[in-house]
Amino acid sequence: MHYYCISFTHKNTDIATREKLSFSNEDKKRELLKLIHTNNKILESLVLSTCNRVEIFLFVGDVESINEHILKTLSLLCGVDRENLSTKADFYEDSGAIHHLFSVASSLDSLVIGETQIAGQLKDAYKFALQEQRCGVHLTRAVHYAFKCAANVRNQTEISKNPISVASVAVAKAKELVNLENKTAVVVGAGEMSELACKHLLNAKAKVLILNRDIQNAQKLCEDLGENASYESIANLKEALNQYEIFFSATNAPHAIITNDLLEEKDYSRYFFDIAVPRDIDVKANEKNIVYAVDDLEEVVRKNLTLREHQAQIAYSIVGTMTNEFFQHLSKLATLPLVKQLRLQADEIAKEQLQKAIDKGYLKHSNHEEARKLIRQVMNAFLHHPSVNLKKLSGTMQNDSVINAMRYVFDLKNENMEGLNLYKCEFNLENNHEI
């Protein structure tokens, strides 16, 4: 049994390919999970899809042919050449997969180190996989331990102090290019990323105009944001594009919604910040139309990374420690029941043989208790060293091999996973809602 991860991120995959691999649509994500499980070696799966990454976390019976199956599935579903995907993807197995999961949850692998959105996105991905019955006890334990790791990183470092996001980085870039004070910035969309962009724009003393298909959502967001926020229907997009100078877009549209044909020629510059994947903006960049997509914000991100580099080193140390702790935790979950089963089996055999001895007259019934105590002492003495050594093996590389051998030799069933409640895990999501 193995943990496994196939990863496409801003580090290894261009935005054009990430657009095609986007699974923000639940129906598309559901179809991907269904196709993933056509390989019977894949026991559990979870798909995390954001503007900067697509991560496929798996628990598999055997890693052989898993890469090929996943790459072919993605190629078929997303229309991307399989060889192209193969050269871009990063593959992680066992401790590498868990270390990567913990790093992602702790925002150490994000475009913006320390951003606070990723944990919520991982929660949503986990809940969806659970709802679709694709995520079982193994990934559940890993994800919940990832939340524990993220909480430790947050509490023991300052990496998320003055939390930032892709939206805040985009606004910071806008502030470098133009004085935002008293300017009206148009924000297309009313989701989480748009809300963050609005808040940062308002903090920069700009005014915001929200354009959205769902007027009620836009109205509610404006009420939360205050008097310097207004809203209109997205039907007014063309008019807004030719009236204002600064635009931020973060919708879940499957195709571009701001295109060249909507733009009239102007004698002033317009600034477009596309913080969506797939991209919302398909405008030809020139001296009058300045366009920034997610991957164009690297310069601001590098400044952020430099400021947080020391805290990131501390955070990676925590992730490494938590990765080791996780596998030790799993080893104990396997080892302790085995020790208990050994003792129970020995006790049952002792009881059975003692009763046979009494029934056949080899032992007087009046001596039953004394004989029982003697047998228990012999049994405890015999099992002492195996029990101690099994506990010592917990967390080591040999642990699984020895446990499997012991189960085979003594014909012990693996009852550790039976009756486990997926909703009652070691680290409950509800207790970590603030991550």
Curated annotation (Swiss-Prot):
Task: Specify whether Secreted is a keyword of the entry.
Answer: no
Q: Which catalytic reaction applies to this protein?
A: (S)-4-amino-5-oxopentanoate + tRNA(Glu) + NADP(+) = L-glutamyl-tRNA(Glu) + NADPH + H(+)
Residues of the active site: 51
List residues binding NADP(+): 189-194
Domain text:
Possesses an unusual extended V-shaped dimeric structure with each monomer consisting of three distinct domains arranged along a curved 'spinal' alpha-helix. The N-terminal catalytic domain specifically recognizes the glutamate moiety of the substrate. The second domain is the NADPH-binding domain, and the third C-terminal domain is responsible for dimerization.
Q: What is this protein called in UniProt?
A: Glutamyl-tRNA reductase
One GO term in the molecular function aspect is: NADP binding
Might you give the EC number(s) for this enzyme?
Answer: 1.2.1.70
Q: Which PROSITE patterns match?
A: GLUTR
Q: Site Important for activity: which residues?
A: 100
The UniProt function text for this chain reads: Catalyzes the NADPH-dependent reduction of glutamyl-tRNA(Glu) to glutamate 1-semialdehyde (GSA).
Q: What more does the record tell us?
A: During catalysis, the active site Cys acts as a nucleophile attacking the alpha-carbonyl group of tRNA-bound glutamate with the formation of a thioester intermediate between enzyme and glutamate, and the concomitant release of tRNA(Glu). The thioester intermediate is finally reduced by direct hydride transfer from NADPH, to form the product GSA.
Q: Which residues bind substrate?
A: 50-53, 110, 115-117, 121
Name its pathway.
Porphyrin-containing compound metabolism; protoporphyrin-IX biosynthesis; 5-aminolevulinate from L-glutamyl-tRNA(Glu): step 1/2
The record's InterPro entries line, in alphabetical order, gives:
4pyrrol_synth_GluRdtase, 4pyrrol_synth_GluRdtase_dimer, 4pyrrol_synth_GluRdtase_N, GluRdtase_CS, GluRdtase_dimer_dom_sf, GluRdtase_N_sf, NAD(P)-bd_dom_sf, Shikm_DH/Glu-tRNA_Rdtase
Entry keyword annotation includes ATP-binding: no
Pfam name, any one = Shikimate_DH
Q: How does it assemble?
A: Homodimer.
- From the UniProt record, give one GO term of the biological process aspect: protoporphyrinogen IX biosynthetic process from glutamate
**What does the UniProt keyword field contain?**
NADP, Oxidoreductase, Porphyrin biosynthesis
Family, per entry? Belongs to the glutamyl-tRNA reductase family.
